[in-house]
Amino acid sequence: MIFNPTVASITLRSALGRRRALLYAIPPLILIGVSAILRLTSPADPSWPARVLGEFGFSVVLPLTALIIGTSVLGAEVDDGSVVHLLATPVPRRTIITTKFTVAVVVTMVFAALPELLAGLIATGPRLALGMFAGALAASVIYNALFVCLSTATSRALAAGLCYVLIWEGVLANLVGGARILSIGHYGLAIASSIAHDPALKPGVGLATACVLGAIVTAGTLAAAVRRLGSFSLRGETA
């Protein structure tokens, strides 16, 4: 069994509680707002939708949302020691990771992928919107696998993840061509571009490369997270 409804329910309540949903909503609301403003002020410019939804959406909004959600579904329990309650139950470590990962992906899709769809519909129409939505769905999966793994590796997962998002995804992947092959944002853009066929998207990798590397990153980071969680003792420390 790779999904535990009880763990999922507790994780979902925690993820959406304590006003966290408002925090998740801020970046996508900015994306939708910017798209609406540009639609009104620059309706004749065909280049801005792909730039805003692609560069800003996939390099800033999506990874930041996934970072906050992905590191919180397990990281908070590791930090405060309450993870020992999970480790003391008969629920397998693999099931804990996959369940929390699934919840993180679903919440990220709601707060990041759906806003990409809405912003795309506002900006141009269904073709670009569907492409961005599909790319955002795929990127949500890969990003959350990475950030859930990161939360098992360090108590400063949010800070480490923020450095990754800002430096690697936000700067290097958009300025250095070779860095794009290891950019989750560009994996999502490749999928979006294959559907939208918008030359302004400019993904740094091809569709096949994005799918293969995305699958490898997802499987590898989840496997590492399971192994790392399995090294915790019942005191919440690594063995």
Regions found by a protein language model. Give the residues of each.
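Aromatic- and glycine-rich beta-strand/loop motifs that create alpha-glucan
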Residues: 1-25
